[in-house]
């Protein structure tokens, strides 16, 4: 199974970039993992929040294949403890060809993206910046990989 993380806009904080790159490299020792960055919209002052979500949504949908299992990182999604998330990933490895996680733009997702999604996942009841969640989520994917393999990274 290939796992993909789609994100809207570049990560700009050099410390986050270094951390994300480190976890992506580690994850690739366990499974094929790729980060796809959709360019940030330009000249958004004349666009409403809904128009921005619509345009970003179209760009997100273009990245998806019909057979993809699509999971949105969304504040209203299901929450898992790390071990539960690892078991969820392990199950998806048996049933999905390509597992695609999506981190939306600053205003969230368009209705079309919600409609296409198979599931929604929330990492916390708290709100994080889109920049921060990229690092946090890649670490959680890595943590799940080590739990699945029984390696001593995660401590209960």
How does the language model describe each region?
Residues 17, 21-24, 54-57, 111:
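Short, surface-exposed alpha-helical segments at coil->helix boundaries
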Residues 1-27:
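N-terminal beta1-alpha1 ligand-phosphate binding loop
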Residues 11, 75-78, 105-108:
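Short glycine-rich anion-binding loops that position phosphate/pyrophosphate groups of nucleotides
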Residues 32-33, 37-97:
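S-adenosyl-L-methionine/SAH cofactor-binding core of RNA-modifying enzymes
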Residues 2-4, 34-36, 100:
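A structural signal for isolated positions on well-ordered beta-strands in alpha/beta enzyme cores
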Residues 111-155:
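Structured adenosyl-cofactor binding patch, chiefly the S-adenosyl-L-methionine
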Residues 86-124:
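A mid-sequence interfacial segment
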Residues 15-17, 81-83, 110-113:
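Short glycine-/acidic-enriched loop or helix-start segments at secondary-structure transitions
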């Amino acid at each position: 199974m290939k796992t993909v993380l789609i994100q809207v806009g570049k990560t700009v904080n050099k410390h986050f970039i270094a951390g994300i790159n480190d976890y992506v490299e580690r994850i690739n020792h366990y499974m094929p993992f790729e980060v796809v960055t959709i360019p940030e919209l330009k000249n958004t002052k004349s666009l409403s929040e809904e128009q921005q979500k619509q345009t970003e949504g179209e760009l997100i949908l273009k990245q998806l294949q019909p057979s993809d299992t699509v999971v949105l990182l969304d504040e209203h999604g299901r929450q898992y403890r790390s071990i539960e998330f690892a078991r969820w990933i392990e199950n998806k490895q048996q049933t999905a060809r390509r597992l695609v996680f999506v981190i939306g733009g600053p205003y969230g997702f368009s209705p079309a993206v919600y409609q296409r999604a198979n599931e929604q996942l929330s990492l916390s009841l708290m709100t994080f910046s889109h920049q921060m969640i990229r690092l946090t989520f890649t670490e959680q994917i890595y943590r799940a990989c080590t739990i699945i393999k029984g390696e001593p990274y995660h401590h209960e």
